[in-house]
Design a protein with these regions (language model features):
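Conserved active-site segments centered on acidic
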Residues: 1-75, 140
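Phosphate-binding/catalytic loops
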Residues: 79, 85-143
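Hydrophobic beta-strand core positions in alpha/beta domains
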Residues: 8, 81-82
Length: 143
């Protein structure tokens, strides 16, 4: 199957998923990549520490605005990548008609991406590092 539209999901859509979205878009500029949250802080920008972590890699995520995951949004995308096994299970149960397109972003490296929300900047660096490796692991599947 060809994946042309990818949705990256975390909880609030202000820390991990904006980073994952930016890294995927950077690696695959020909694809449509967006993000959403299970309990999104709708309309909020990316967390300042997420912005700082990505600035250090010369990736600007300041224009990001959080949006809520919905059934309609799920239907729009070919592949939906979440941060943990728990999120993957929840999404497959609650969006059962879309379950075949839901995967953990760290599927190929067998890792969850820890939530750095309200934690020190080093936790954002750790999440960014895992997301970078996870995105790299999808490279040949999305090309």
């Amino acid at each position: 199957m060809s994946f042309k539209k990818i949705l990256v999901v975390c909880v609030g859509n202000i820390c991990r998923s904006p980073i994952g979205e930016a890294l995927l878009q950077q690696q695959h500029p020909n694809l449509t990549v967006k993000s959403a949250g299970l309990s999104a802080l709708v309309g909020e920008g990316a967390d300042e520490k997420a912005i700082q972590a990505m600035d250090e890699w010369d990736v600007d995520i300041r224009s990001h605005r959080a949006q809520q995951l919905t059934q309609e949004l799920m239907q729009t995308f070919d592949l939906v990548l979440c941060m943990s096994k728990d999120q993957e299970s929840w999404m497959k149960q609650n969006y059962s008609s879309q379950r075949g397109k839901v995967y953990r972003i760290g599927h190929w490296i067998n890792e969850n991406v820890a939530d750095p929300y309200k934690l020190p900047i080093d936790k954002f660096y750790e999440s960014r590092h895992v997301l970078s490796r996870a995105v790299e692991s999808w490279k040949d599947k999305l090309a």
